[in-house]
Regions:
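Juxtamembrane helix-capping/reentrant segments at transmembrane boundaries
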Residues: 1-7, 49-74, 137-144
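Hydrophobic transmembrane alpha-helices
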Residues: 4-36, 83-125, 130-208
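A basic- and aromatic-enriched beta-loop-alpha substructure that forms the phosphate/nucleotide-
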Residues: 21-60, 64
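A general boundary/transition motif marking the beginning of the first structured unit of a protein
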Residues: 42-46, 73, 98, 187
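Active-site pocket-lining segments that scaffold enzyme catalytic pockets across diverse folds
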Residues: 75-81
Length: 208
């Protein structure tokens, strides 16, 4: 969805936007999308596979109505709205391009690209670790030694980079931080809490 929306914004970019700044944001977005797709594809188990978080949430439903609310609201609607909110800084910057590219844009670009590299490295380290596992264990080497969830750290920094891009319009665009905060709440609060709770139950070497 983010990449599709970005391409749609590009339709009018020559008339309404700063092409260089838009190109920088597009680079970050496509780099992130390639990493995400590759990491999903190499671990895909087929159409019958369902994320354990979805299974857990739906398993708590006591009737069909609760099941519907969980499936439609928590699993589909809220994440989709969170992505739209997180894209606000990027969309705003495309339609209100501000001045020519300056140092803050390069800071945003560096943060965005670095964030995806953090995800790529942490993904590969976890992939290699899981291939040799015979029972649930906690990853404690590489980037995972310094952060419990380095992949999520990269995800948050990725979305934060678009907020930095939006500041090319000045501090008047500061309200767009709401998009980054929304994604932070989804990733760093909701997903992390669920993963840590599950790890405490399954891994004897995991500490809260």
């Amino acid at each position: 969805i983010p990449v599709v929306l970005t391409i749609l914004c590009w339709i009018d970019i020559h008339a309404a936007g700063n092409v260089l700044r838009a190109g920088m944001m597009f680079d970050v977005m496509v780099f992130w999308a390639i990493r995400l797709t590759y990491n999903w594809a190499r671990s895909w188990d087929g159409f019958t596979h369902e994320d354990w978080r979805y299974v857990m949430m739906k398993g708590k439903a006591e009737n069909k109505f609760e099941y519907f609310l969980t499936d439609f609201g928590a699993i589909h609607l809220i994440p989709t709205l969170s992505v739209f909110m997180a894209l606000l800084p990027m969309n705003y910057t495309l339609y209100y391009p501000g001045p020519e590219v300056f140092w803050l844009d390069w800071v945003a670009y560096a943060i965005g690209i670095s964030a995806v590299f953090i995800q790529i490295i942490s993904d590969q380290q976890m992939y290699n670790f899981r291939r040799t596992l015979t029972e649930p264990q906690t990853m404690q080497s590489g980037l995972w030694f310094y952060s419990r969830h380095p992949n999520y750290l990269g995800e948050i920094l990725f979305w934060f980079s678009f907020f930095i891009f939006s500041l090319s319009n000045g501090l008047s665009a500061s309200w767009l931080i709401i998009g980054t905060i929304t994604m932070y709440a989804l990733v760093a609060i909701t997903s992390v809490a669920m993963m840590d709770s599950r790890s405490l139950q399954r891994r004897h070497d995991f500490k809260a």
